[in-house]
Amino acid sequence: MAQRGRPRTFDRDAALTSAMHLFWEHGYESTSLSQLKAAMGGGISAPSFYAAFESKEALYKEALERYMSLYGDLTKSLYDASIAPREAVLMTLQRAAKMYCEGEHPKGCMVASGAMGAGASGSEDITQLLQGMRGRARAGFHACVERGIERGELRESTDAKSLAIAFDSFFMGISVLARDGVPYAVMKKAVVQAMGMWDCAVKPARD
């Protein structure tokens, strides 16, 4: 009697990274189970997939966690009080431009791209998760602008909410433009232009 071969196995960690890249590139709704299984390799069956990851939604959430663990520090400078507020905003935008435009991974931001298509995902949990992540980035810009006002770098009349939204809009826009193929060299110059929004609100020096 022929000996039964061993069942095919797969590297779960590598499979998670592959899933992260697929979701990053195509979003939650547009990434199919067949695409995920093919990317994972090892001839993984549907039962094996569900045994390993429970569901597509659970896998997406885990992939987001992986993404944040690898790339989620882009906005940390916004909350670092030891960094000058203007410098913190500049660092965040520069880092985002470089990461979104370069590297051996899909272009753009997985969270920003996912948030724009979250309404069609059919999952309220995923929509809320992505919106929460986006909200934290927006809150970071707001906190940075508030520090600028408190430290006397920006005029007291500065509308912190509006300026924060302007920077957050540019931050999210970098992701879209990176996916459209705008090169980092161009984006880096655009970041310099965007910082003009901060400079326009700078408190005039006294004579």
Task: Tell me what each language-model feature is.
Residues 62, 76-107, 160-167:
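Hydrophobic alpha-helical connector segments
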Residues 107-113, 158-177, 190-197:
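Hydrophobic alpha-helical segments that form the core
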Residues 88-89, 102-125, 176:
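Amphipathic alpha-helical segments used for helix-helix packing
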Residues 12-17, 29, 51-79, 90-97, ...:
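An amphipathic alpha-helix adjacent to DNA-recognition modules
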Residues 99-103, 147, 167-185, 197-206:
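Amphipathic C-terminal alpha-helical segment
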